[in-house]
């Protein structure tokens, strides 16, 4: 099939060249229609030969996963050569596991989404007296998801996970632990190289809880649905936090900024930015998010779930 692949103006800014270069190397006929390295692209259909291909692994694991998934249709098996440090490595492992399961006649088990659960862990950090029950998750030691690390990360911060069978977990905050993390004179540092999707929820809730932080190995967050480092710095400034970012880190050292009475957050058309700042309403009591409907990309029922735990949500047209 011949055709044009295009997307929203926001996603047009995401670099696509590592994937296009890899596909061209195995016979794909792809042409950039506007900016070199970014969508839209024109694809002329044809059979791909497969075989050895090199791909830059330092921008997004999605390029690797895409090649792995479609390689079953190629004439020759795929042999991937990865350049640079692999970011979001657990997603590559998850793709590998899925392909292995597809060789089995039994139906694969589809887990609940740990990255989506991170926003409710964030809520419990901000409202430690209220428990939250989440279903459909697999215990971290059984899960194929790297983002299952959220349970250990939040345990350190003071949110405990109490399992009731393999699939249902009750979250509750431990004020003593939360207060001890808040009183630390140096920032809590986490390496987020394998779990970048957890950064927005963690950054917003830790700042609102008064816990200083420094997240490293986050350079690939500049190439998500938005430049998430820049988006977090800008929007967290609106709620009073002087956040610093660099090539490969984002941090908050406790410094505060003046905050306006009416907070209007731009979602940057990024579902994780919208969800992270929605949770902030638990502490700020009132917040407006422009473009909040973008949460439908990964969590269509998000606002409905927030209503269940007491949020009042109003759509402004």
Question: Whereabouts are the PLM-identified features?
Answer:
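Short, structured segments at the rim of ligand-binding sites
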Residues: 1-317
């Amino acid at each position: 099939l011949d055709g044009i692949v295009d997307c929203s103006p926001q996603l047009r800014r995401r670099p696509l060249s590592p994937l296009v270069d890899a596909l061209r190397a195995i016979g794909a006929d792809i042409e950039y229609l506007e900016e070199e390295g970014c969508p839209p692209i024109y694809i002329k259909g044809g059979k791909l030969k497969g075989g050895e291909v090199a791909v830059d692994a330092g921008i997004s694991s999605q390029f690797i996963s895409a090649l792995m998934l479609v390689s079953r249709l190629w004439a020759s098996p795929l042999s991937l050569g990865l350049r640079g440090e692999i970011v979001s490595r657990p997603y590559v492992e998850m793709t590998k596991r899925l392909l292995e399961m597809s060789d089995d006649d039994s139906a694969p088990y589809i887990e609940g989404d740990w990255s989506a659960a991170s926003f409710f862990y964030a809520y419990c950090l901000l409202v430690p007296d209220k428990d939250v029950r989440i279903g459909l998750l697999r215990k971290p030691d059984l899960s194929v998801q790297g983002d299952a690390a959220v349970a250990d990360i939040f345990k350190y911060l003071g949110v405990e996970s109490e399992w009731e069978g393999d699939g249902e977990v009750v979250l509750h905050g431990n004020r003593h632990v939360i207060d001890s993390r808040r009183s630390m004179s140096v920032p809590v540092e986490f390496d987020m190289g394998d779990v970048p999707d957890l950064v927005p929820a963690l950054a917003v809730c830790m700042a609102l809880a008064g816990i200083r932080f420094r997240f490293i190995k986050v350079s690939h967050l500049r190439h998500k649905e938005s430049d998430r480092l820049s988006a977090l710095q800008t929007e967290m400034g609106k709620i009073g936090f002087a956040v610093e970012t660099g090539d490969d880190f984002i941090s908050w050292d406790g410094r505060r900024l003046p905050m306006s009475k009416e907070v209007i957050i731009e979602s940057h058309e990024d579902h994780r930015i919208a969800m992270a700042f929605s949770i902030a309403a638990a502490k700020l009591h009132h917040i407006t998010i422009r473009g909040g409907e973008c949460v439908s990309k990964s969590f269509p029922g998000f606002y409905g779930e927030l209503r269940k735990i007491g949020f009042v949500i109003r759509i402004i047209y």
